[in-house]
Amino acid sequence: GRTLADAVNNADVFLGCSAPGVLTADMLKTMADKPIILALANPEPEIRPELAKAVRPDCIIATGRSDYPNQVNNVLCFPYIFRGALDCGATKITESMKLACVREIAALAKQDVSDEVAAAYQGKELTFGPDYLIPTPFDTRLILRIAPAVAQAAEESGVATRPIPAY
């Protein structure tokens, strides 16, 4: 059978949602140039970012942990999807509502952060790039952008039961 080492050889992306330490330094060395590593096992990722960067300085890595850059966590989605759904009385969560959320997160990542957010993350580079792919969980713009976009998507897909409030 095929092993994980076989699967990651020359791979561009590793998506892990499994167990701590399963992606080894030797495996990472075999990946394509500028690999994207999504090591999302919690609380310990499949490979720690400091090890990944030591072995492959060209990699982009995200984990589910708040103590590393690029925290991929549902905390960026769920509260704002629900806020938008509740605000318009959505009868269900649709794919278009989830996509509206994701698109707003992507758009926010490319914009300059507020002074308030920068102060909360003193000393961390919060400019779109390898160490800042998605907004931080404490970015106050998330609720202001995502909830209305989700409510709008609910209205457009016919699941809203009341008008969208002014945000």
For each feature predicted by the language model, list its residue ranges.
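A structured beta-alpha segment of the ubiquitous adenosine-cofactor-binding alpha/beta core
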Residues: G1-T30
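Short, conserved loop/helix-junction motifs that constitute active-site signature segments
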Residues: L28-K34, K53-R56
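Short, Asp-centered acidic motifs that coordinate Mg2+ and/or phosphate
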Residues: D12-V13, I36, I60
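Adenosine-phosphate binding glycine-rich loop
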Residues: A39-A147, A151-P163
